[in-house]
A protein has these predicted regions:
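Transmembrane beta-barrel domains of Gram-negative outer membranes and organellar outer membranes
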Residues: 33-293
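Cleavable N-terminal export/targeting peptides
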Residues: 1-46
């Protein structure tokens, strides 16, 4: 087992992350207590309404997902990711600001291509630690119509604790999402384009497109079917190694532990197109704490 030794800078980063997660949990718990009567009604309806809210990327609901991903079939071995993805909504007048953060904890056995978290990996003997943190904020109508949308900026911060775990660059660009929710469906597309603007001059520039089409079909008693494919294009790579395109899906379930609303899902995807040496399969399990407003 490898032991990660943190510098003072990285220790401060971890401390800030831990305090942020604690604050999110406390705020969400207070929201859940204040809305307990409403949630009891949703529970009697089998959780379908709450499932639809959870499947809306710009829904005004506090949540704290933990997504564990296992990439299998890369030339250098299997990479694992634990993405901590808090969602913090803020309502300002007729608008919602949906703050979404992705904090990746990564183990990589060496250079692994074709992953969204590390667009331009460098050779090495493997590393374990914090990757580059992604922060996105979406401006979305507080009272959406039939077509739900959100748009805003996205930033990748150079926070990786090892060169093998990040791009070595600060990157930014636009992000947007559009979806519809005709019961029992949720269907939409999230997109993001990033360009690097600062960082290690010896590392390759970042020019990455991410497209995430998603479809959910809600069943009874909180069960649902899902496909949530993350397509990426590394515009810095040659055309034969540019795209990663997965195909697959999974199943999810809304449930409770005491009064705590929860969501879990299990997914598997096969990369029908991927760069040389990239993983063939990606399997993920998500556990999400929900704090409806």
């Amino acid at each position: 087992m490898k032991i990660l030794l943190l510098s003072k800078k990285n220790f401060r980063i971890f401390a800030i992350l831990l305090w942020s997660l604690f604050a999110i949990l406390c705020a969400g718990h207070l929201e859940a207590v204040e809305n307990s009567a409403k949630e009891k009604k949703e529970t009697r309806n089998g959780g379908e309404d709450l499932a639809a809210k959870t499947q809306n990327p710009v829904g005004a609901m506090y949540s704290l997902p933990f997504k564990f991903t296992f990439d299998y079939g890369a030339d250098n071995g299997e990479a694992t990711f634990l993405n901590i993805q808090p969602v913090i909504p803020v309502t300002i007048g007729d608008w919602n600001l949906i703050n979404r953060v992705i904090m990746p904890l990564i183990h990589t056995p060496g250079l692994v291509t074709g992953t969204p978290e590390i667009p331009n990996p460098v050779p090495g003997n493997g590393a374990t630690g914090l990757g580059d943190i992604n922060y996105s904020v979406f401006l979305s109508p507080a009272e959406p119509g039939k077509i739900i949308w959100g748009i805003g900026p996205s930033v990748i911060m150079d926070t990786a604790t090892d060169d093998q775990l990040g791009s070595g660059k600060w990157s930014a660009g636009p992000t947007a999402v559009v979806l519809i929710q005709p019961k029992p469906w949720t269907m939409g597309l999230l997109g993001r384009q990033l360009w690097s603007f600062a960082g290690d001059s010896d590392r390759a520039n970042v020019n990455q497109l991410l497209l995430e089409p998603f479809i959910n079909y809600n069943l009874e008693k909180g069960w649902y079917l899902i496909t949530d494919m993350i397509l990426t294009a590394n515009w810095q790579a040659d055309s034969s190694n540019r795209w990663t395109i997965p195909l697959g899906g999974g199943v999810g379930k809304m449930f409770e532990i005491g009064s705590q609303k929860m969501n879990t899902k299990l997914e598997a995807y096969y990369n029908i197109v991927n760069p040389d040496g990239a993983p063939d399969w990606s399997m993920s399990w998500t556990l999400q704490f929900l704090f409806p407003r």
